[in-house]
């Protein structure tokens, strides 16, 4: 499994991306290489181009076929369209060609509280589309019948184009595959899965099911050659598709087996498994860890926050993401259960853990503790592009180093860097009368690790990310 998973994604670094050379694929089909592959079909002295081509290699064409609207691919065809070529694009993504400015006008605010986590690789200037297409359409160009196939996955509305030229059946497949069984990236598959009742943020590789369906559709088309938007031309399509599907399924099976989400969405995770792995998914689910139904009396659960009570009745709050939390703290304070608040600890920057901090500070002017990797993102959230980041900067910040400890009202508090759910994440070890509790924010549940969203940068590598967190837990004193 590890070998399959490790070979799935192309590493975009020196030596990681295979660069093709310009060459003839057939008597009437030529590969032209630029930032993206360009496929040039010539008939009757005229040209049709798929994807695009550098201006110094192809000056004009009658049509340019776009497989999807991602900027890194679509820009390759812009110059040809500006010189008169008719742009053909998927109907489902037409708005990204026609109205990209609307996306960017909304972006300065939409990037906060961003649960959808879709790509920002959107065109910055429009490309006029002369014709839109969808699966089942057939384009007639100079005697060639070009079949349009819906192939969502890498993007929601992508299409592929299939045509036979000189007896060779070509598939121009965009980014559904790279080389002999790879994928350019997993980040682009993030999406909601409505039939599993999984929202965008929790939809880790949510379009993997659609991608596999698209790959199987292409497999059934009897292709001789696949020309993706980038990377090497694929001359053994069936083998490449089967390899990629096996790798995708291996990665997804591994992901599901240790996902924290199963604790919250058990039935939904069964649905996720069937969508990608089939009716008998055989996921080696991690055994559920023991969990404590009721914490000790000095820990008061308040929604997704925890209020620590000291020996004198003073309080120390962990996270504050909603008004209901502030209202409950105020109620406890007014009722005498709580005798004032001494501090607030932030585990991570997500809005459901920080949104009500300012409201809390208006009523309890306390220091806001955070471990050093969080200092900048809490003070300058607008400088970051990360999921569900809250807009307002936090004030009253008191930044401490990893491992910093302090006594507080009969407890010992130790602050830890804990880059689990997201790279900017912390934990708090609280000790009282021999009881030790590590508050880990959203990093773990009894079913595994909280890895819903690839853009959180939850890393898996020796000494980093979740493995660093597990090492930290192993190093805790027994108790």
What are these regions (language model features)?
Residues 30-31, 123, 128-130, 150-152, ...:
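Short Gly/Pro-enriched turn/cap motifs at secondary-structure boundaries
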Residues 23-24, 41, 136-141, 308, ...:
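Short acidic-hydrophobic surface loop/beta-edge motif
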Residues 101-129, 176-200, 242-256, 382, ...:
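Active-site-proximal loop/helix segment associated with metal-binding centers of metalloenzymes
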Residues 19-57, 160-174, 178-179, 285-334, ...:
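Conserved beta-strand hairpin/beta-sheet module of binuclear metal-dependent hydrolase folds
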Residues 47, 138, 145-238, 248, ...:
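Metallo-beta-lactamase
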Residues 231-283:
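Binuclear metal-ion centers of metallo-dependent hydrolases, dominated by the metallo-beta-lactamase
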Residues 29, 54-138, 324, 332-407:
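Active-site HxH/HxHxD metal-binding segment of metal-dependent hydrolases
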Residues 5-16:
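Hydrophobic h-region of N-terminal signal peptides that target proteins for export
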């Amino acid at each position: 499994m590890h070998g399959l998973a490790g070979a799935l994604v192309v590493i975009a670094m020196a030596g990681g991306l295979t660069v093709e050379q310009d060459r003839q694929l057939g008597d009437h089909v030529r590969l032209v290489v630029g930032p993206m592959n360009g496929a040039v079909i010539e008939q009757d002295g005229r040209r049709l181009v798929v994807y695009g081509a550098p201006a110094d290699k192809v000056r004009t064409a009658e049509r340019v076929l776009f497989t999807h609207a991602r900027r890194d691919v679509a820009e390759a065809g812009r110059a040809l369209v500006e010189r008169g070529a008719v742009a053909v694009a998927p109907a489902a993504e037409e708005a990204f060609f026609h109205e990209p400015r609307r996306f960017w006008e909304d972006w300065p605010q939409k990037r906060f509280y961003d649960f959808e986590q879709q790509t920002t690789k959107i065109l910055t200037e429009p490309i006029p589309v002369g014709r839109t297409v969808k699966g089942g359409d057939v384009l007639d160009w100079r005697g060639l019948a070009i079949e349009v196939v819906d192939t969502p996955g890498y993007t929601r509305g992508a299409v592929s184009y299939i045509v036979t030229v000189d007896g060779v059946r070509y598939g121009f497949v965009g980014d559904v595959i790279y080389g002999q069984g790879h994928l350019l990236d997993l980040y682009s598959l993030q999406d909601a899965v409505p039939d599993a009742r999984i929202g965008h943020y929790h939809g880790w590789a949510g379009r993997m099911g659609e991608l596999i369906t698209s790959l199987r559709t292409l497999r059934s088309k009897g292709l001789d050659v696949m020309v993706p938007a980038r990377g090497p031309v694929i001359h053994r399509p069936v083998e490449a598709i089967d390899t990629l599907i096996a790798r995708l399924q291996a990665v997804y099976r591994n992901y599901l087996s240790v996902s924290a989400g199963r604790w919250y969405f058990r039935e939904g995770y069964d649905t996720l498994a069937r969508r990608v792995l089939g009716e008998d998914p055989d996921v080696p689910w991690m055994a559920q860890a023991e969990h404590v139904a009721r914490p000790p009396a000095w820990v008061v659960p308040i929604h997704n926050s925890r209020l620590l009570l000291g020996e004198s009745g003073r309080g120390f709050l962990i996270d504050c993401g909603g008004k209901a939390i502030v209202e409950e703290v105020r109620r406890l304070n007014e009722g005498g259960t709580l005798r004032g608040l001494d501090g607030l600890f932030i585990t991570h920057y997500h809005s459901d853990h920080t949104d009500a901090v300012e409201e809390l500070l208006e009523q309890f002017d306390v220091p806001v503790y955070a471990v050093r990797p969080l200092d900048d993102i809490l003070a300058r959230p607008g400088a970051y592009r990360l999921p569900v980041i809250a807009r307002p900067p936090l004030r009253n910040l008191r930044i401490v180093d990893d491992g910093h400890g302090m006594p507080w009202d009969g407890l010992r508090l130790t602050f830890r860097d804990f880059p689990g759910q997201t790279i900017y994440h912390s934990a708090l070890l609280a000790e009282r009368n021999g009881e030790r509790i590590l508050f880990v924010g959203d990093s773990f549940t009894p079913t595994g690790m909280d890895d819903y969203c690839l853009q959180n940068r939850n890393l898996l590598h020796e000494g980093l990310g979740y493995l660093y967190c597990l090492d930290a837990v192993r190093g805790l004193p027994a108790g």
